[in-house]
Amino acid sequence: MKTKFVFDLLAPDDILHPSNHVNLIIRLI
């Protein structure tokens, strides 16, 4: 999954701040 890889680069602290990960996805939609 390439998108997952990109998200990991943009939000490497996804585990500590899962809300940031969700906000990135919402912005792309």
UniProtKB/Swiss-Prot annotation:
| A Pfam entry, by short name | Corona_NS1
Organism superkingdom: Viruses
Q: Which family does it belong to?
A: Belongs to the coronaviruses ns4.9 protein family.
**What name does this protein carry?**
Truncated non-structural protein of 4.9 kDa
Give the organism, scientific name. Bovine coronavirus (strain Ontario)
